[in-house]
Structure formats: structure tokens, C-alpha cells
Amino acid sequence: MIIRAPIRTKTKSFRGDQMDFKFPSNESLPRGTLEEYHLNNHHLLNDVFAAENGVSRDEDGNSQILSDYTSTSNTNTNSGYSSNGYYSFANISDNTTSSPRIVINQNETARLTSSDSNKSDFFASHDFPGNDSLHYSSSSVVKNQLHSMEAIPEGNITGSISTAFQTIPTADNVSYDIAPSSASSLLPRKSTSKSAILPSTQEAKPMTKLNMEKDIKTIELNNSVVPKPKKKLNRVPTIRRVESSRFSNSRYSSSVSSKSSSSRCSLKRSKAIRCKGGLLYYFTSLGIKIKKKLRKLRLVLRRRLFSYNVQKVPSATNSKTTKSKANINNKSKKRGTNLVNKNSNSTPRQKKSQRYVSNLQRSISSKSLVPVLAPQKKTKPLTVDTKFKANHPQSEDSKVGSNTPRSPLVSYTPSLRRTNSSIRRAASILTASATMTPANNKNSFISVPDNVSHAVTRNSSMYSRSRLVRSKPSTALNAIARQPSIVVENKVIPLSMNRYSIKEEDEYVIDTSSMRELSPVNSVCSSDYDRESSESYSNYADAMETTEVDNKDRVECNNEIQNVNANNEETSNEESYNLMKHYLSTVIAQRIMLRVQIARIQNNKSNVVYMNKSAETNSTIYEDLADSLLTEYEADGSSSQIFDGVSVRADEEEEEDEDDEDDEEEEEENDDEEDEEDEEDDEDDEEEEEKRKEGEGRNLAKEVDELAELSPMRKQSDLSITLRSPFAMLNSAYSNSIISLPTGVVKRSLTLPVGMKI
């Protein structure tokens, strides 16, 4: 069962804020025997508790049970009752329930009907006095089953109606108190006007004795039709607006008076609680939408009236497509006129927009472009080839600024707005190899002098086969004409034909062939390193850079290492061949032996005989198994013991295999003979069993002693595990289930089978 306990801070439905409100369940109800129908509506519960406990206005103990959220019209619960613990949306209107209307016939009762159910509630229709009000009462169908309804005593009594089938709750979170408008037309105009003027917080006055007597007389006349009510209301309930703490503005607080035409109106009123689907929510959301549209319209009008554009913008009647096309055309025309009029771009921002780099000569220096690690004393800076003109195939996009004189560095490719990380990945590096950017390439506009070409092309394929790839020095990003590229799924895909070599910052390709010990020429002391680095920037050696001395040392070292390796490989190959041969021969021999033993044990014919023999002759199966295991695994497994007598050991094992096969045949013959003898001696089995049990008790102690004597064969550090049946000492018949072997004796190999059936 799901029990939800919401926090309702803004409601005062049961004399105060209900912070600890819980929905009713079987646990919170009294233990009295009540029918399920009595638990059906909250007003019935009010009557029951008022009858049993007596009503006190300050008592709030029943507020957990007197709930507004259950009714028979509830479709969100399983059974329609309040005891299942689920939230029921009975009083929350979804704009599908119609307002109740009154069917009036003369000299008959006025019947309050609703279109969604066949239930009806009756009014008493008489000639009422001027100050009398309409009385609700329960129908005659439920007369014998239910208590007649009483007014619910609350702190703010606003004259709520309670009937057998329908309730109109009185809470501050209720948007309307609904009363049929035709009911008010039955009364004189004075009474309806007075009741309409009554404020929402006015409490119902107690009935006077005269009014009570008159009402009793008039009801007794029509007693055959209308049952007698217990209490009655003092005035006609009217449709009245109830303020909530949320919407307490003045525009929402206007009172709505009842009219005679409202019953025939097709408007669907919100029954109780303001919610998504009620009329109030609809109108508030409508107002919000209208406000947004008005703000947009105001902005559009201000743009139209106070725009400083030279050309007029098309009118607002045009569609969105024409607006977007006109804006694009205006921008392109302005850009073309600006480029034509201003031959010399004044501001650096305009230069930067046209990809003109102002600080190119200053930024491209010898330190930034020539590799730091290259041992060169004199370097020349890169020179920009101003005679070079970029030839672009004319397309539709490039015709925009075709009339403008082009600077030699400008390439009009559409710019991409990227993040810092994508710019860092896609940034061009000017230290690209000359082989990757030939002179006839249309994208290469930087000419490299011949002296620097070797240092610049150090990352080309002929130099970088066995080198560490390091992140190369580059100029500032704003001083470089960027490479045209596309960012797809956060990866930069270049569009140019290998214009520059792009290296990721974390791309370190380490070649193990370049790993070598530093020769004394290459080894750098800290003092030497500090002195040389202070003198010149590019004068120290690294594993990345190679010199002629390094090459000579490397060749000599490689030759020596190859000779030593060749000799070592020959000896190691012979040793490994011999070792594997010995190992495989021993393993194969042990496997063959173990399989023969397992086949002997698993034989069905010999199995029965082995069991009988084990009882007679001190469990020979276990002795055979232990002997075979001990003889085969007696060696410690050290390489000296294995490899010393390999040939002798293999010959012995082959002979043992042949002997085992012969033993199997002999044992099978013996088994057949023993089976015949057992059939003849069935009568003497009982006497033999008694003798057997006596002998087994003695043999048990002998077996344990014999097997315990095996442990000194191994080292004392080995553990010995004894597997013993719990019935061994109690019942000597199960003494053949004892296995006791030291762990040092039984050796296990990874290549041998582990599981055995015994």
C-alpha cells in the first residue's frame, strides 16, 4: 500500500494549516465495525465521529480522517473507497464534469441532477417565507442505511451543502462554492439579494425557534415525498469567489453572483480545487501567452520605427523566409560596399575579421620557428613571400568580396566559431615539412630559406622514423592563418591537402629502437646543462637529436650486441629444447599411468568385487591408489631430480604400464571366479558379516597408524589432511571410507586431470 503524506501549507480546510496531513487508511480509522459504505465519503465520516465523540471546535484529531479527497465518483482508486491509501482526484476538475442543474416541476420536489450519474438529490419545493432558505436532504433510497446529514462544524462556516451523494467543500483553496441558480429563483428577490451580499467569511447564524417550527410544519406536509432532515441551512448558498493565499490580487477577488441563465450555460465550472485543467488556470495561462506576444510585438515595432538602417526593411506582412532572405542580402551588400570604400582597414578588429595578421613579422622569429633542440648557432627567420598570390577557384561564396584588393596573406574561407580546445587541436603549426607543402601547392604562402629547411623538416618521414614525437614550438594562435577544417563529433577534420602537419598535444609516439644508453658524449651533467643553457638557447643534446658521434657509437654498440645475442640464442635454444623434451616425456608418462588407474577403478564389473575385497582385505583399493600415487609423485619436482634420470624413469613407467594392463586382465578373471563363489556361498554371508564387523574395528586402528606413518616421508613443514567419515568410529562397516594422505605426498600438476571417482 502506498501512503503519501504531502505538505499542504496554504490550505486552511480543517481549522488551520495541515502540515502533518496524511491520507486516510485502515490504520487510522477506529476499530468499530463499520460498513464500507460508511467509509465512502468524508461527510459520512464526519457524521459518525460527531455521533460517537461529540464535536468540539478546537479538536483537530480527526483531520487525518475527514478527507476531502474521496468520493464514489473517483476513478483513480481501485475500489472507490478511501481506505486504499492512493491519492484520489475526486474534487479536482478536469473540465469534463458538468455543473448540476435543477429540474423543477410545480408541486413536486426540485431535483438536483448531474449528467454524469443517475443519482439525484431532492429539494423541498413549497411556498417559502421571505427569510426561509432552501433545505437539502438525503434521498429516500438511502434513508434507512445512513444518518441524515448534519452541517459540518468548522471554524469558518460558509454554509456548505452536504448531501448523500455530493458535497461542496468549504476550504480556502476552493475556487468556487457552487449552488444551482434556479434554486435561488424559487425564493423572493429580497432573500437572494441578501444572500448574495453576504461575505465569504460570515458564519451561519443559528436558527431561531420560529423558523424551526415553520420548517417542521412545511416538511411534515410533504413527508411522503421528502424525508425529514436533521439540520438545515439558514440561507441559499450562492456561487461566490473564494480567495486563496496564492491568488489574492484585487483582480481575482471580484465576487461572482448567481444568475438565472448560468444553469443553461455550457461553461464547465471547476468543482473544487484550482488545478491544471480548471478555468482559472486556463485564463491565467492565456494571459501569460498574450503578454509574451505583446512584448514581442512591441520589440518588433521599436525595431521598425527606430532602426538606423539606410535601406528600409520590408514590412511585417511578409513571411519569415522573405525576412531572412532580405536580411542576408542587406548584410552582404553592406559588406561589399565597406570593402570597396575602405581600401585601408583602419581598426585592427576589421583587419582581424579579414584574417590580416598585423604582428606576423614580430611573432615569427627565429626562436619560435627554428627547433630549440637543434644544435645550430645561426638561424634566419622565416620570410613571407609577398609576391605570392593565392589563386582561388571562383565560387558563389567567393564572389562577395571579389572587387576588393586582396592582401597576400588573406584567404577567404568561411570562418568557424570554435572553443579554445578545438582551436588548440586544429591550430596550424608553421614548422611543417617542406616535403609536405611543395612550392606549387596553392595553400602554401610561406617560403622557407634553404638554410633552415633541414631544421624545419625534422619531422618528415626520412628523419622521424626512430624518434620521439614531441610537441613542437608554434607562434601565437591569432598570428597564424588557420587551417580550414570541419568539427564533427568534437573532432577536427582538416579540409586542406596537408597544408601543415597537425600534431596532438598528447600524441607521443615512442619507438623502442631509439632507446639506448647515453654515451659519455651525450650524457649531460647538471652544471654543464645550466652553463650551456645560459650561454645559448639551442646548444644542449637530447635523445631526440642525433649527431655524427651518436651514429658511430650506435653502430659499434649494435654490432657487439648482435654478436653476443647470436651466441646466447644458440645455447638457449638447445637448453629449452632439452628441457621441453624431458618435461613432456615425464608428463605424458604420468598421464598414461593415471588414466589406467582411473579406468581400473571405474570398471563396473570390478567395482563390486573391489568393494567386497576392501572389506575383507583391509581396503586394498586405497592402498593400491596410495601406492601408485606415492611411487609416481615421490620426487619433489625439482629440475635436478626430474632431468637426471629421465631415460631410466621413462623406461620404468612404460614397463609399469604394460604390467598394469596385464594386471587388469588377471583381475577381471579373478572377479568372474569370485562372483561364482559368492553365488554359491549366499547362505554363509550373514555369519561372515558379523565376523567382518569385529575385524574391521581392529583393522581401522591399524590403517590409521599405517597411513600416519607415511607423513615422515615428507618434510615436517608439509601439512597432512585426514578426510574421515563421521560414521567411521561409530559404525565400523563404513571404515572403508577413510582417506588419509599427507599433502606433501600427493602432488598435483596443472596438466593432469583433477577429478577422480572413487
Swiss-Prot record:
Positions where Phosphoserine occurs in the chain: S25
Comp. bias (Basic and acidic residues): 690-705
Keyword field contains ATP-binding: no
Region (Disordered): 55-77, 314-414, 636-708
Cellular component annotations (GO), alphabetically ordered: cellular bud neck
Compositionally biased residues, Polar residues: 338-348, 355-368, 400-414
Native source species: Saccharomyces cerevisiae (strain YJM789) (Baker's yeast)
Biased composition (Acidic residues): 651-689
Protein name as annotated: Altered inheritance of mitochondria protein 44
Biased composition (Low complexity): 315-330
Keywords: Phosphoprotein
Gene designation per UniProt: AIM44
Subcellular location: Bud neck
Main location: other
Similarity comment text for this entry: Belongs to the AIM44 family.
